[in-house]
Amino acid sequence: MTRLFVAAWPSEEAVAYLRSLPHDGWVNVRWMPEDNWHVTLAFLGETEIDDVMERLARGGYDAATAELAPRLRVMGPNSLVVPVDGLDQLAAGVRTQVFDAAPKRPFHGHLTVGRSIGKRPISGRTTTGQIATPCSFDVTEIALVRSTLSPEGARYDTVGTVACR
């Protein structure tokens, strides 16, 4: 069994946009490495790769456009995120394929850029405000991603992809 999730990876342009987000004014944040930036469409937990890939392959998912908000926000006490719109239908399609029953948690599109350090919550906010121009990227494939946890942080590896139409 492997810890898995289904994700949309950001484009190079979106990564550049995320890199430009202001880091000032936030307290107790460990900034995530760029190669971990993604939008989770469905978190699966510990499961079998082959079973999930078989389910995902049945999908017939429509491509979508992810719209990154021009701001950071705290989600729960422990995550600093960029809200993401435009992926609700794609996430619903993925979730229909990979879960036997509807998930208890609704989909809230976001891309995590920071996590809290220790048990203290993230606080503060950027003093430079919103970035003037929002950014979007096309999602033309979804990825099944393995999450390996360690004291240094999570490592994510794509173990399979499915093209969107």
State the predicted function of each range.
Residues 1-165:
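Histidine-dependent nucleotide/RNA phosphoesterase domain, centered on the 2H-phosphoesterase fold
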